């Protein structure tokens, strides 16, 4: 069953309205990595984008908590 962003992921966003920002981040990172997101994209390429999103979100959270490890 599709969620707010139209994907079939079971992950739920804790912050209402964050889906648009996450999608924007996903497409920006994919562009930086030269990945064209779509049905033909490999799991490895998608994983690299997802992994980078996770790294950036963790870094952002650390900075917000005052432990700014970069």
Curated annotation (Swiss-Prot):
Keyword set includes DNA-binding: yes
Entries under PROSITE patterns matching the protein: SASP_1, SASP_2
Site label Cleavage, positions: 28-29
Gene3D superfamilies in alphabetical order: Small, acid-soluble spore protein, alpha/beta type-like
GO biological process: DNA topological change; sporulation resulting in formation of a cellular spore
Misc remark: SASP are degraded in the first minutes of spore germination and provide amino acids for both new protein synthesis and metabolism.
UniProt name for this protein: Small, acid-soluble spore protein 1
């Amino acid at each position: 069953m599709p969620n707010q962003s139209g994907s079939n992921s079971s992950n739920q966003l804790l912050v209402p309205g964050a889906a648009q920002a996450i999608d924007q981040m996903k497409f920006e990172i994919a562009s930086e990595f030269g990945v064209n997101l779509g049905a033909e994209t490999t799991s490895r390429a998608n994983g690299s984008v997802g992994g980078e999103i996770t790294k950036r979100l963790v870094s952002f959270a650390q900075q917000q908590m005052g432990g700014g490890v970069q």
